[in-house]
Amino acid sequence: VRIARTLAAFGLCLVAAAATAQQDRTIRFGHLNNADHPVSFGVKRFSELLAAKSGGKMKVQEFPANQLGNEMQQQSALQGGVQQMSAPATTSLAGIVKEFGLVDFPFAVADFAQADALLDGPLGQALIAKLPEKGLVALGYWDLGFRNVTNSRGPIKRAEDLEGLKIRVIPNPVFLETFKAFKANPVPMPFAELYGALESRAVDGQENPFSVILSNKFYEVQKYVSATNHVYAANIVLVSKKFWDQLTPVEQKWMREAADEARGYQRQVSRAAAQKSVGDLQAKGAQFNEVAPAEQARMRQIAKPVVDRFAAQYDPAIVKLYNDELARIRKP
């Protein structure tokens, strides 16, 4: 009995020593959105949860608004282990894992429930599984929202209204080819340069979720806001694999739990903000219009050859999973 007690006491001492030895870690978490954007609110909630779980040993320093560089620069910094975390749009990952382009296929999901089911299910996990070999670890998907077109020329009510418009797009092949299918002139450009390009009329328009349009004051340089809802956009919570591999299993568990718990909050805040943003944009003088469901269906058909062409370039097993998942989530 005495030996058992001694061993038990020794075990408790080891646990206590491990907790005491748990080193303080500072996590530099960068993103391109402003501090009043729902992505930033997600970072703040993640930070609070992680601090609570780790007893203050794991601290998050947030760097919003491109402070650590644009999305590509931050991606490289994560891969190199210079920066610990970021939350870019999934679109930015298509350059290193081309199958992330599936998430950007136009008119794929009709609502938030379908979007969450697609990303939180087997497809989203299959994409995440491809990242460690690229030096990244993903902790899940946050909401950015449905993307919508703004421009300085006129309302977009039908596909033909996009013809000839110079539209800034994310430097992503699916986005480029989708807008070419609508006979627009897509211009790839880093987000940090966008406001100036709109102001100088170097481009006529751009496409982003409502909350991004409002937060970045694009209404100052864009008169027309059209609810095209052409792509559902998500952010992905990324960790440098070099940093991740330095963490203890307990620290990794805390990070996964904090990210999971922050996700529901971030999505709720983001979707409420999107709804409010429409009214706020109109109050700022933006001219807002919806696109009729029948016209959206027509636009989906116009973009279908783009979808088919890119799908043929991707891993067939993941494309099959994508199509199976779409069939599953679209069932009434």
Where is each model-derived feature located?
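N-terminal signal peptide c-region/cleavage motif recognized by signal peptidases
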Residues: 15-18
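N-terminal secretory/targeting leader peptides
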Residues: 22-114, 122-125, 129-332
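Bacterial N-terminal signal peptides that target proteins for export
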Residues: 1-10
